[in-house]
């Protein structure tokens, strides 16, 4: 299979596939006599795992670790589960931070009259000027 076939099947771009190869995140493909990369089902599995791991929030390094676990016949599902639950905890923390930012912005918006005057508690609060406090 060539890189364009793999790109179509995995939903990755050829550029992304080459990038993952350069970073050592996938098994290096064999080269044909003409120098073209030749991919196997193993490559499809690794690249699909990388794409899907990235989609659910794993960073590049973590995704590579999952590929290593995928290729390790001695892996323990407990390791994969632990990493997944750690990622869930990270995402939950990020959600809490986003909710806090949302609440702050809503409080600022509620404090602003939103009329034609120049007085804007949002700008004043964000700039630290004039000691206006929202909410």
Swiss-Prot record:
Function: Regulates the transcription of the copA and cueO genes. It detects cytoplasmic copper stress and activates transcription in response to increasing copper concentrations.
GO cellular component, as recorded: cytoplasm
Residues reported in the UniProt entry to bind Cu(+): 112, 120
InterPro entries noted in UniProt: CueR (IPR011789), DNA-bd_dom_put_sf (IPR009061), MerR-type_HTH_dom (IPR000551), MerR_fam (IPR047057)
Any GO BP: positive regulation of DNA-templated transcription
Superkingdom of the source species: Bacteria
Protein name per its UniProtKB record: HTH-type transcriptional regulator CueR
PROSITE patterns the record matches: HTH_MERR_1 (PS00552), HTH_MERR_2 (PS50937)
Chief place of localization: cytoplasm
CDD domains: HTH_CueR
GO molecular function, one term: DNA binding
Lineage: Bacteria, Pseudomonadati, Pseudomonadota, Gammaproteobacteria, Enterobacterales
Signal sequence residues: none
Oligomer status and interactors: Homodimer.
């Amino acid at each position: 299979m060539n890189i364009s076939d793999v790109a179509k099947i995995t939903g990755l771009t050829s550029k992304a596939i080459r990038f993952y190869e350069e970073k050592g995140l996938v098994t290096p493909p064999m080269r044909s006599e003409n120098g073209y990369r030749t991919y196997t089902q193993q490559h499809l599995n690794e690249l699909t795992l990388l794409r899907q791991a990235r989609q659910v929030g794993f960073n590049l390094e973590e995704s590579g670790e999952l590929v290593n676990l995928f290729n390790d016949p001695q892996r323990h599902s407990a390791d994969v589960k632990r990493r997944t639950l750690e990622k869930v905890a990270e995402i939950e923390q990020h959600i809490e931070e986003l909710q806090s930012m949302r609440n702050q912005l809503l409080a600022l918006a509620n404090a602003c009259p939103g009329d034609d005057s120049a007085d804007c508690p949002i700008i004043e609060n964000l700039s630290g000027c004039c000691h206006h406090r929202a909410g």
